[in-house]
Amino acid sequence: VKLLDTLNEAQLAAVTNIHGPTMIIAGPGSGKTRVLTFRVAYLMHSGIDPFSILALTFTNKAAREMKNRIEQLYGTDARNLWMGTFHSVFSRILRSEADKLGYPSNFTIYDSEDAKNLLKTIVKEMGLNDKLYKPGYVLYRISLCKNNLIGPEAYAVNTDLISEDEGNGRPKMAEVYKNYTKRCFRAGAMDFDDLLLKTHELLERFPDVLYKYQHRFKYVMIDEFQDTNFLQYSIVKRIADVFQNIAVVGDDAQSIYAFRGASIANILNFEKDFPEVKTFR
């Protein structure tokens, strides 16, 4: 394939190694996303159905660039790829499965402003000090918990979190979290973190749904793997468990999303979770 002539030896090996778990570690500016793009193109060139390829990115811009590049090479077939950010791909899955979790398929997605406004209302209704329970801080706290699979019930009995809240003069944090969760559900709404959390719940609670997506996505790829957090990795690990054709592209020297609970541990865990992994540097 002429396309591959532009790759160096290491990149070529990473692109053409399409079976089994693969980790591609490269520094900034070394064309990591390009490797992933070529890998998708190579899969399609090898006759793999684009509908069975899941490629996850961190920004809409990266997803758009990859999709456009592949469309230039393969035309409209590229539109069948499941390619986008974690949030956009998971919201697409949730739209078709939401009823199982008691949500309408046209559930609303709250952005951070919507979420903060709801929290402001809850704090006011509970008669709490809005200087202590600032919506931005409360949302950050809830977000961190959701991304570590700590729901309102688990929060309420977590002695570390409770004593931290009490020490900071916020003893009602668990109750705020509980009310926030209830109100979102009642409104048929999910916030950004719910798009991950509810996908995880869906795959955990419904083996038939897990089976469906495990067998749909025979090839899974993640860009900027060092930026994935515990929850994102948990979901993708479940999906890739059957075919094990998972490729992650990461840079062990940078983690720009650390504030989202992103975890360098994922890079280390990957080798443990997928012992057959081939690593390319």
Model-identified regions with their sequence ranges:
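ATP-hydrolysis module of ASCE/P-loop NTPase motor domains
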Residues: I18, A78-L81, D99-D194, F217, ...
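Conserved N-terminal phosphate-binding loop of PLP-dependent enzymes in the Aspartate aminotransferase
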Residues: P275
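Glycine-/small-residue-rich beta-strand-loop submotif within the FAD-binding core of flavoenzymes
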Residues: K272
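Conserved helicase NTPase motor core
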Residues: T6-T16, G20-I24, L54, A62-A63, ...
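Short acidic/histidine-centered micro-motifs embedded in hydrophobic/aromatic stretches
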Residues: F86-V89, V138-R141, C145, K198-T199, ...
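P-loop NTPase Walker
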Residues: V1-S105, I109, Y211, A265, ...
